[in-house]
UniProtKB/Swiss-Prot annotation:
InterPro entries: AAA+_ATPase, ABC_transporter-like_ATP-bd, ABC_transporter-like_CS, ABC_transpr_CbiO/EcfA_su, ECF_ABC_transporter_ATP-bd, EcfA2, P-loop_NTPase. It comes from Bacillus anthracis. It is a peripheral membrane protein. Disulfide bonds: none annotated. One of its GO terms (molecular function) is ATP binding. Forms a stable energy-coupling factor (ECF) transporter complex composed of 2 membrane-embedded substrate-binding proteins (S component), 2 ATP-binding proteins (A component) and 2 transmembrane proteins (T component). Residues 3-246 form the ABC transporter domain. ATP binds at residues 40-47. It is found in: Cell membrane. It comes from the Bacteria. The keyword Acyltransferase does not apply. This is Energy-coupling factor transporter ATP-binding protein EcfA2. Its EC number is 7.-.-.-. Transmembrane segments: none annotated.
Length: 293
């Protein structure tokens, strides 16, 4: 299910003295089945942008097309319920949205709300909890007896139980330790590969953006500043730093090595493994090449 933003603008508290423009002239497409990252400094418009994907927000100007659904300025999309089934959104700290007395009831809430029978919803709950790496035995427990990491996985299972075609992740690893972050990101990538899900990741973690995303969209002051593959985007390191976007650690180490040893590493290395390989290659050639990154 392809997603397209066409000249999208969004203003909060439109036509009031408190009006504030959050998005403008946003033109971007997310073809079906891809893995995408949206990055940018705090306040750049990332979260506002993704709230247009299932109709939580409506454009002030322009159109957002999600498959056969069109959300346009001044026009109400009548079929938001099926759209919200197709586009699953995992917001920051989703475990705060848990409320039922058992894990099973919490995961079943979404499917039953969309008309699925109780028996079918329970089956979806069993499948979803295994997808997120938890044991089915947890279904009978209160979600509030679980660890923070388990609660987050339960909340994500609730989204997956609705069998979305698009999975939108807004800082999904916020507050987790490094091990938990890595496990969750690997889980999302596995779901993307095995289920063919379109994944749109909003993140401040540049390592995750570089590692998983096929395309990266850089937002700045409410509009698209840059778009391309990880290699293309992070080759603009100076411009990114000027607008407050962090760089992957491998690029920071690359700069430090260049300055310390007086060598030039042409490639925009996106992992420590790549950096090690490139340093070896440069040293073998004598250590002096023009730096184009």
């Amino acid at each position: 299910m392809e997603i397209t933003f066409q000249k999208v603008e969004h203003r909060y508290q439109y036509k009031t003295p408190f009006e504030r423009r959050a998005l403008y002239d946003v033109d971007v497409s997310f073809p079906s089945g891809g893995y995408y990252a949206i990055i940018g400094h705090t306040g750049s418009g990332k979260s506002t942008m993704i709230q247009h994907l299932n109709g939580l927000l409506q454009p002030t100007n322009g159109t957002v097309q999600i498959g056969e659904h069109f959300i346009s300025a001044g026009k109400k999309e009548k079929k938001l319920k099926p759209l919200r089934k197709k586009v699953g959104v995992v917001f920051q700290f989703p475990e705060h949205q848990l409320f039922e007395e058992t894990v099973e009831k919490d995961i079943c809430f979404g499917p039953t709300n969309f008309g699925v029978s109780e028996e079918a919803a329970k089956q979806k709950a069993r499948e979803a909890i295994e997808l997120v790496g938890l044991e089915p035995e947890l279904l009978a427990r209160s979600p509030f007896e679980l660890s923070g990491g388990q609660m987050r996985r339960v909340a994500i299972a609730g989204v997956l139980a609705m069998e979305p075609e698009v999975l939108v992740l807004d800082e999904p690893t916020a507050g987790l330790d490094p091990k938990g972050q890595n496990e969750l990101m690997e889980m999302f990538y596995k779901l993307h590969k095995e289920k063919g899900l379109t994944v749109i990741l909003v993140t401040h973690n540049m390592e995750d953006a570089a590692k998983y995303a096929e395309q990266i969209v850089v937002m700045h002051k409410g509009t698209v500043f840059l778009q391309g593959s990880a290699e293309e985007v992070f080759s603009h390191a100076d411009e990114l730093e000027k607008i407050g976007v962090d760089l992957p650690m491998s690029l920071k180490y690359k700069r430090a090595i260049e300055e310390k040893f007086g060598i030039s590493i042409p490639k925009a290395t996106l992992s420590l493994e790549d950096l090690t390989h490139e340093v070896v290659q440069v040293l073998r050639k004598g250590g002096h090449e023009s730096c184009s990154s």
